[in-house]
From Swiss-Prot:
InterPro entries registered for this protein in UniProt: RNase_HII, RNase_HII/HIII, RNase_HII/HIII_dom, RNaseH-like_sf, RNaseH_sf
Coarse class of the protein's main subcellular location: cytoplasm
Record-given protein name: Ribonuclease HII
One MF annotation (Gene Ontology) recorded for this entry: RNA binding
Catalytic reactions of this protein: Endonucleolytic cleavage to 5'-phosphomonoester
Gene3D superfamilies documented for this protein: Ribonuclease H-like superfamily/Ribonuclease H
SUPFAM superfamilies: Ribonuclease H-like (SSF53098)
Cofactor, free-text remark: Manganese or magnesium. Binds 1 divalent metal ion per monomer in the absence of substrate. May bind a second metal ion after substrate binding.
Domain RNase H type-2: 1-189
Pfam families linked: RNase_HII
Length: 189
């Protein structure tokens, strides 16, 4: 059995980095799997439910903004990936990771695949779970801080996000290790 692993949320200035691990059922295929960035929001949300219903096993995990600031975004991403793999109810024989690096600490044979979210269904499914879950987090953060527009820009460094920071400052969930946030706090970069 093969598990696909992918992440969402490395680039934003706020919130957690989210990883998902998925083992698909070869006898219960899911149509339309692709890199989450190539799908509409509506299609991702539909597949989010279908993946959870049809996969043999799936797990979503995260590393929060504090862990990102303590470890750095790469190591926090690897932490979230390890947590996602550890959270699977079935242990896979192999783990396919989207990207060019393998997280340390996964005891199962891993293979890094650049562009794997577009070429391997297991990674595509993980990409969708991670992206939709993180987008849901941003919608909740938007309810908590409606002046920031998190539901729209998802925490990415957009003009609207920078304007909100300039007017309202940063929120607790901002990643203080990121240069734009440090500048807003007048911390040396």
């Amino acid at each position: 059995m093969i598990a696909g692993v992918d992440e969402a949320g490395r680039g934003p200035l706020v919130g957690s980095v989210v990883a998902a691990a998925v083992i698909l059922d070869p006898h219960n295929p899911i149509d339309g799997l692709n890199d989450s960035k190539k799908l509409t929001e509506k299609k991702r949300e539909k597949l989010f439910v279908e993946i959870q219903e049809k996969a043999l096993a799936w797990s979503i995990a995260e590393a929060n903004h504090i862990e990102i600031d303590e470890l750095n975004i790469l190591q926090a991403t690897f932490l979230a990936m390890r947590r996602a793999v550890d959270g699977l109810q079935i242990q896979p024989d192999k783990v396919l990771v989207d990207g060019n690096q393998i997280p340390k600490g996964i005891s199962i044979h891993c293979e890094a695949i650049v562009g794997g979210d577009a070429s391997h269904a297991e990674i595509s499914a993980a990409s969708i779970l991670a992206k939709v879950y993180r987008d849901q987090q941003m919608k909740l953060l938007d309810e908590k801080y409606p002046l920031f527009g998190f539901a729209k820009h998802k925490g990415y460094p957009t003009k609207a996000h920078f304007q909100a920071i300039a007017i309202h400052g940063v929120v607790d969930e901002h990643r203080r290790s990121y240069a734009p946030v440090r500048r807003a706090l007048n911390i040396d970069c």
